[in-house]
């Protein structure tokens, strides 16, 4: 089973950067929600391995969204990372396990992503096939 990462981000440039990162990790699937409402709607269909949450969403703060997600059975122990431009934000007092400060850089993101979701080498898995579309593995939650 493939690992799924739910990324909640409303800024298209940040989504594009994250899509670029995930193209370099073909064993992972990225699901993008652009606000808290679409993220909560996606929770009924997903059981992600990781949550990446922007803090300044158009309809709620990322910490509020994470609190709501933690009320869903089975979602209490999913690692959650705040992805923010708020330089002063610290995860103490929240259930975020880490903070990734913007601006984000691809090499740093790859290293941090690999620390949270260790690449799984399975001898019976076929080698990843390059896809025609650069972002063909990204799903947008509606």
Mark where each language-model region is:
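C-terminal output helix
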Residues: 104-117, 125
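Conserved acidic carboxylate
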Residues: 9
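Active-site residues of response regulator receiver
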Residues: 54
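The feature encodes the CheY-like receiver
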Residues: 58, 76, 88
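Acidic catalytic/metal-coordinating carboxylates
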Residues: 35-38, 61-67
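Hydrophobic/aromatic residues positioned on beta-strands within the core alpha/beta folds
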Residues: 81-83
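Acidic, metal-coordinating helix/loop segments flanking the phosphotransfer/catalytic sites
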Residues: 32-50
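Two-component/phosphorelay signaling modules centered on CheY-like receiver
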Residues: 12-31
């Amino acid at each position: 089973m493939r690992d799924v990462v739910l990324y909640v981000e409303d800024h298209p440039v940040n989504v594009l950067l994250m899509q670029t990162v995930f193209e370099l990790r073909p064993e992972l699937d990225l699901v993008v929600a652009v606000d808290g409402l679409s993220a909560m709607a996606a929770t009924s269909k997903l059981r992600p391995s990781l949550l990446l949450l922007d803090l300044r969403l158009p309809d709620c703060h990322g910490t509020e969204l994470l609190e709501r997600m933690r009320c869903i059975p089975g979602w209490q122990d999913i690692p959650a990372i705040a992805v923010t431009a708020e330089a002063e934000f610290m995860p103490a007092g929240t259930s975020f396990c880490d903070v990734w400060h913007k601006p984000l850089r691809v090499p740093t993101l790859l290293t941090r992503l690999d620390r949270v979701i260790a690449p799984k080498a399975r001898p019976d898995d076929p080698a990843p096939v390059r896809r025609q579309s650069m972002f063909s593995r990204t799903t947008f939650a509606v």
